[in-house]
């Protein structure tokens, strides 16, 4: 049953591919999501708001759909901190030129590792959110303030950041 759940549809080129069911009343599991999309592929093949990759030159990468919705049309979600090779390939082959990575604070090393996979081909900026806060907690205005205070990073800078996290 999806009673008490907010349903967030995932479209790809105008076609419904997947959905998130997020509990908003507190009873039952936090999420009630399907294991696969309508084509039978698992969530590692899904990007929320995938179409933004072809529409914008700068795109924000978040973990969850609600975080992406907080940022707006230019944000995508990867369905978690562990980003699949398929998702990385989609980011690399897109028309987008700049990525702003906004993963949750517990995923800092994942964010830097994603940036390292992209930086040879795209401009990347890893924005570290304050401990205990995701994009949704901070809101759009505070998140964008952090984004504007962070500059794009080079491969060497990302290596230094990764080493400092270990």
Regions found by a protein language model. Give the residues of each.
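Phosphate-handling DNA/RNA-contact segment within nucleic-acid enzymes
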Residues: 1-97
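TOPRIM fold recognition
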Residues: 29, 56-59, 67-166
């Amino acid at each position: 049953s999806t009673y008490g759940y907010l349903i967030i549809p995932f479209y790809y080129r105008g076609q419904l591919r997947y959905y998130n069911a997020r509990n908003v009343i507190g009873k039952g599991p936090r999420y009630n999501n399907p294991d696969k999309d309508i084509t039978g592929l698992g969530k590692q093949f899904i990007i929320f708001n995938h179409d933004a990759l072809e529409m914008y030159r700068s795109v924000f990468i978040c973990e969850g759909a609600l975080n992406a919705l907080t940022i707006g049309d230019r944000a995508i979600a990867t369905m978690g901190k562990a980003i699949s090779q398929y998702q990385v390939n989609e980011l690399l082959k897109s028309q987008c030129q700049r990525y702003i990575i906004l993963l949750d604070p517990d995923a800092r090393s994942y964010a830097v590792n994603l940036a390292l996979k992209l930086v040879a081909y795209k401009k990347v900026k890893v924005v570290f959110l304050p401990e205990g806060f995701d994009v949704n907690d901070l809101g759009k205005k505070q998140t964008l303030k952090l984004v504007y205070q962070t500059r794009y990073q080079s491969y060497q800078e990302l290596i230094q950041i990764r080493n400092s996290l270990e």
